[in-house]
């Protein structure tokens, strides 16, 4: 966990991406974490994973620092519902489970996600996808709760 935490706090997502996509950095990570298969798998997954997921993970990591567990679960529910409707979810299922070619064609690059329009797209995933008053976890949070801007 500590290597991931250090990485997430080491700069912006573009900086992290440059590091994780670098072959030299990958060799260094493999040396530093030779005994840590979890970290190695996390880096490999990042390098081949969906850029929208990377941007969402980075944003979520930084949004939840001061939220309660109830607020985090509420927010993650919002993100999960939006992700299920995301074209990249379908593409990932196709590439991994249906065609099994392991060659997904993601809808956006990381550079797209970091643009103003891309950030707006990422931010949409945090909004309440349910009609007012129908969020399954809505009763957990009051309107004055920290993080209530995510409660709609």
What are these regions (language model features)?
Residues 1-152:
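C-terminal alpha-helix plus adjacent terminal tail
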